């Protein structure tokens, strides 16, 4: 089983050298797209993966940087006359999003290629969509995928209550375990969920540096708005030290940091962030680039 980091950026701001969040889990002949940020179809092709061979997509949560490529995915498969099922999974609300995107395909489908009598399949003919809860599991041959809620949206005390949820996911085979946390803050449930995983893929955030840049670039932003953003950055993501703590407590083998916003993590600063993680975790640490394979 292999994990490919298709897009390692984070947040809504496009970056020059990192694509929006999307990854691929490859097991045998099966390729599962995990999150589908803007540009995911192109990143698949750059990784040598034919997007037409992707039959499953799993979404961790519904922030735009993780779902911005879904419409393109539907449209390209429609234009290329897809016939095989495309199954899309995600937290509650996923089916509503996909239904809306499929409805918006009506006009481009009717337009087609401008050839009289020519027809295209509608995405509702090949797309199957399923809303997931943390207790659900997916099984594809001997690949088992399990889920747990994380703290990207709310504190653990609110787990199980009505409201939006953000999911982490674990991929288990007989020989390897991979945990993709998606976006999350510190979370005890996630620590337990990640026990003894061979690979832990998780976000890396430096809230202080991000907020400094936000204030510099937006001098007229209200203090209320700035405080709201600062709270989101601090509570709903992981710092280098917190990522090290998660990896240490979970006893994982290898940490891969993704979801890197702005440009403060670069070739010059990567060693420092690896050092911060390694102060808490003695295993292997990698800060991923697009198209890395693990």
Positions of PLM-derived features:
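Binuclear metal-dependent hydrolase catalytic cores
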Residues: 1-179, 185, 192, 267-294
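Cap/insert and terminal regions of metallo-dependent hydrolase folds
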Residues: 166, 175-179, 185-284, 288-289
């Amino acid at each position: 089983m292999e994990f490919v980091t298709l897009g390692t950026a984070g947040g809504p701001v496009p970056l020059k050298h990192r694509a929006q969040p999307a990854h691929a889990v490859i097991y045998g002949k099966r390729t599962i797209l995990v999150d589908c940020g803007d540009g995911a179809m192109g990143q698949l092709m750059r990784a040598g993966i034919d997007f037409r061979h992707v039959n499953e997509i799993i979404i961790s949560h519904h922030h735009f940087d993780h779902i911005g490529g879904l419409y393109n995915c539907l449209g390209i498969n429609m234009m290329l006359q897809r016939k095989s099922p495309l199954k899309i999974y995600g937290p509650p609300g996923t089916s509503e999003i996909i239904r809306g995107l499929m409805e918006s395909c009506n006009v481009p489908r009717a337009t087609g290629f401008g050839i009289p009598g020519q027809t295209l399949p509608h995405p509702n003919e090949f797309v199957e969509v399923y809303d997931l809860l943390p207790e659900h599991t997916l099984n594809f041959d001997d690949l088992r995928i399990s889920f747990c809620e994380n703290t990207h949206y709310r504190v653990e005390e609110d787990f199980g209550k009505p409201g939006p949820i953000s999911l982490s996911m674990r991929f288990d085979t007989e020989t390897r375990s991979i945990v993709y946390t998606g976006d999350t803050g510190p979370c005890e449930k996630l620590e337990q969920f990640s026990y003894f995983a061979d690979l832990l893929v998780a976000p890396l955030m430096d809230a202080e540096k991000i907020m400094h840049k936000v204030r510099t670039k937006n001098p007229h932003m209200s203090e209320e708005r700035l405080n709201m953003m600062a709270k989101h950055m601090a509570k709903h993501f992981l710092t280098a030290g917190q990522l090290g703590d998660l990896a240490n407590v979970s006893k994982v083998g290898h940490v891969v940091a993704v979801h890197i916003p702005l440009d403060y993590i670069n070739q010059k600063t990567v060693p420092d962030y690896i050092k911060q993680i390694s102060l808490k975790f003695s295993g292997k640490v990698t800060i991923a680039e697009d198209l890395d394979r693990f």
